[in-house]
Amino acid sequence: MRILNWNIHGASGIRPAKQAEIIAAILHVSPDVVLLQEVPLGAGFLEGLAAHGYATTEPDKHPIGLWENKKKNAAAIASRLPMTELSPPEGLRFPRLFSVARIGGLEIASCHIPNASGFNSVAKKLGLTPDIKVTHLERALAWLDGGQGRLLAGDFNEPDFFRDGRAIGFEATRAADRDRQRTIVDGLMNSDSITHLCGHLHAKSDEPSHWIKSGPHPDRKGWFDHALSANKGRAWSATYLHELRSSRDEEGKERYSDHSPLLLVGS
């Protein structure tokens, strides 16, 4: 099975011509399953994939949270294999940011963890507090731990390295959230029961999956895009397709997205 995870950077909308280019890039990679974040709802993107034989989940049937209402974007799954859409975990403030489906014997989730800790003025305006972000991380961990044969990938936002060198953490500004968040991140990224499929690609010398352009530490490397598996019986290879992030159009703008897609191949 070939799974492509990609934040297509559609939170503020994608013009139709660029949507067509992104779909063409996906078709060139030829994944069986596509896990998407920042899908612009009502803009025809999922319908464009459906025209090429991909069944898609329906994120707009879930309740609208404040963030989605503001940005009109969601996480979604598209599959050329038979797929049954499942409900997102209970307790999410933004259920449209967590799409779940069963494909064969595998349960797969596409998630977008709310961006809350690094941009406090924006977070406050949108009703996003660090606690909401931590809760989404907590639900992601509970979902992975809740059944065999589960795989989750998506944009986790705002990465930060632990001082002791463990793979990756996620910054929290409030002390009350920090310890709770790091415990959850340890469960996601550094546990024996969950495999961090792309953690070996996050050395400081490696190409990032996203350049952080704003906030307190702009113009630095970031690995926002992750894949995690709770199935020890299945091996996955992981490769970032950085060329799709670095590709530029004639105006020097990103041709596709400011995130590198992550290709997973299961054996």
Stretches found by the model and what they are:
Residues 1-24, 79-267:
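Active-site regions of metal-assisted phosphoester/phosphodiester hydrolases
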Residues 1-52, 67-73, 258:
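N-terminal, active-site-proximal structural segment of metallo-dependent hydrolase catalytic domains
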Residues 29, 52-56, 192, 231:
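Alpha-helix boundary/capping residues
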Residues 33, 37-118:
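Structured beta-strand-rich core segments of catalytic domains in phosphoester-bond hydrolases
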